[in-house]
């Protein structure tokens, strides 16, 4: 008898491009399922941006509280920190408790913690409730992304993961507008928006099917299931992807965070103009995600281009003589970011089997939001060394260019290594 096949890694996305999805990918049921997953993935974005427009009013309300200058901004940022720290643990719970069950529970609890500032009068208690919002966001984001990996395969999976990026970019702009409009009636009013998750939870319970491991591998050989069942968690390959994701998230978020300060340094102080620039850059993220979905290139092939575009955008911002050129640089950067995010996510997903998917996506999600949390700290550190925020963009341009070159070299090396043919077992 021939020797048993060695453990097979999860196939890259292009290798299973023609494989059937685990779930039906047409009809009203498919569209409803996809809508629920995209809506769920937008809930953490709601937590990140909704209250930004009312922070000044919130500061005025708690002006008598010691430490208000630190606590009020923390109410905005602490959910992201909680998400970064707890998403890996949420991934472990996802694999053990079940994706659908945890998603439904987390979506309900999200509404309870999210609306808590409506009746809390202590600023410290509000910040604590915001931290708990981040805990539920970690579970929701991990569950939604993992379910996309469970329900779909190949390029369909890649397309819907990229769609997640598009929905996040669009929803961020929409939530800012909602928060600003609702905030005109009082700083507490925007927190009512968190109750929308109570509408999503019963729909998720009714219309999201219970995921199950796909059985494509069973067709390979009767010996494969036993071997794959003992397959260890892919720590080493996933660690490299997660480290690259932390760095990529810093490149992705820096200009979104620093844009208003850079424009202010050039004399642009009108909030309408700053908002217009932010909306244009958000549109570039959507365009980048669309570009990713419209081609058949693998994530490994896209990453050098994505990091190169981010680096080029930073370089233009660094050398920009006026706000228009600065905005063009930010658009180039965000175009690269729109390609980068789905590339990194699909790359991580391709390394994971069903049993490991929750834990792996939790690690990836934590890495991404850790990079988001670190980006302003990185800019502060670089600015203290090079003397200005604009010059720090030049340092990031150089680092992005180095990463792009290294990824391009790695892609060429992989392309030069022909895969060994798999010997078929005669029946």
Name these PLM-found stretches:
Residues 123, 129-169:
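Cytoplasmic helix-loop-helix junction between adjacent transmembrane helices
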Residues 84-122:
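Conserved MFS/SLC helix-loop-helix module at the cytosolic interface between two early adjacent transmembrane helices
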Residues 74-91, 279-291:
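Central cavity-lining transmembrane alpha-helices of secondary-active solute carriers
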Residues 299-344:
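C-terminal transmembrane helical hairpin of 12-TM major facilitator-type secondary transporters
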Residues 109, 113, 124-133, 324-332:
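Paired small-residue
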Residues 154, 163-209, 213:
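Helix-loop-helix hairpin linking two adjacent transmembrane segments in secondary transporters
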Residues 351-387:
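A late C-terminal transmembrane helix in Major Facilitator Superfamily
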Residues 54-85:
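Extracellular/periplasmic helix-loop-helix junction of adjacent transmembrane segments
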